[in-house]
Design a protein with these regions (language model features):
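Negatively charged
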Residues: 2-194
């Protein structure tokens, strides 16, 4: 029997290449995301220990709120399993450099997308560059889309396919974006709430 430390480096590196980070809680995931986003050196060390962020297994996570909020981040996470996530509140808030595809995420269980791509304002007048298709998203369970794309000035993708019949809050959903208001059926009940 070999101890891992007594194996040749080539074998250890091969074993590590199969390691996939599988966080059990939001706290675990948030901690490693923070390590990933500190700087390039930290990203390299985090990649060595946890594997590349694009390969992380997020199937156990139900809450991704604030996950990348205020971080400098633009890596591919399109293959993340988000099918159990219910909360994406402020997930990419103030992540001004993020512009990666997310169109094939299964967001069918998400109820909260409040400020998901929101960009804060201030003396620097920064704006999000996010402009990726999201037309394949099933948002039929979302209740809150308040400020979802507010400040995402580049976002101009069609969302006409979205079923927003359960949304109760769309305040400033497209504030300061160039997005045309989608052709959605919105009930009088929803208009009264908006």
């Amino acid at each position: 029997m070999y101890l891992l430390t007594s194996l040749p480096d080539a074998i250890i590196n091969k074993i590590k290449s199969y390691v996939v980070f599988c966080p059990m809680t939001k706290k675990n995931l948030k901690y490693v995301v923070a390590l990933w986003c500190i700087n390039e050196n930290s990203k390299i060390e985090t990649c060595k220990k946890y594997g590349h962020i694009s390969l992380w297994n997020t199937e156990n996570i139900t809450d991704m709120s604030y996950l990348f909020s205020n971080f400098r981040f633009n890596d591919d996470i399109s293959k993340w399993n988000v099918s159990n996530v219910t909360n994406m509140n402020r997930m990419f808030r103030s992540t001004k450099s993020f512009n990666q595809p997310l169109n094939y995420w299964d967001v069918s269980n998400v109820t909260n997308m409040n400020s998901m791509f929101y960009m804060t304002f201030g003396k620097y007048k920064a704006h999000s560059i996010f402009n990726q298709p999201l037309d394949k998203w099933n948002v039929s369970n979302v209740i809150n889309m308040n400020d979802m794309f507010c400040g995402a000035k580049k976002f101009n993708q069609s969302l006409n396919n979205w079923n927003v019949s359960n949304v109760r809050n769309m305040d400033r959903m497209f504030g300061l974006s160039i997005q045309q208001v989608p052709k959605w059926y919105i009930s009088k009940k929803q208009i009264d709430i908006i």
